[in-house]
Amino acid sequence: MTADELSRLIDRHAGALVLYARQWTDAPEDVVQTALLKLVRLGRPPENPVPWLYTVVRNAARDAQRSARRRTKYETRRAEHAPNWFDPDSETGLDGETATAALDDLPDDVREIVVAHLWGGLTFEQIAATVGGSASTAYRRYVAGITALRGKLGVTCPN
């Protein structure tokens, strides 16, 4: 298939393929792009590429739908058995929504480190390797983030 033929095929059918995939997945553009890449990678294009694309898009979109369902079930089960991070009946009166809003107010680089350490369980060395930088910089940003959160939430350190 030549580049011009592929371009015409995309111009004529990409929108309809995206609409077709949307009934099964929240990422229809990704599914269509993957199908087009499969078409390009074929040694010899199919005799009728449009029906072939619809078949590939349908299968990929349904696979994505099944994966999303499995992921949602898994995440729901994990969340049900996870310890509660915020106790609405605690003396502090701290609730998840308030804490989330305060966390959202942190600079992106600081929030990333706080979340990675507290909820991800990563060490400062691991965080440094992930975000690029030193462990001491990750630690300083973590401390700054926790200090800012305590200030916004009116929570004092028990020590």
Predicted regions and their residues:
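Base-recognition residues in the alpha-helical recognition helix of bacterial helix-turn-helix
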Residues: L19, Q23, L37, R41, ...
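Amphipathic alpha-helical segment used for protein-protein interaction
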Residues: R12, P83-A116, G120-T130, R140, ...
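DNA-recognition helix of helix-turn-helix
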Residues: R58, R62, E125, V131-C157
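Structural recognition of an alpha-helix C-terminal capping motif at a helix-to-coil junction
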Residues: D30-L37, E47-N59
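Arg/Lys-rich amphipathic alpha helix in sigma70-family domain 2
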Residues: R58-E80, F86, T92
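Hydrophobic recognition helices of helix-based DNA-binding modules
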Residues: L17, A21, L39, G43, ...
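A short, charge-rich alpha-helical start-of-domain segment used by transcription regulators
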Residues: M1-E29, V40, R44, R111
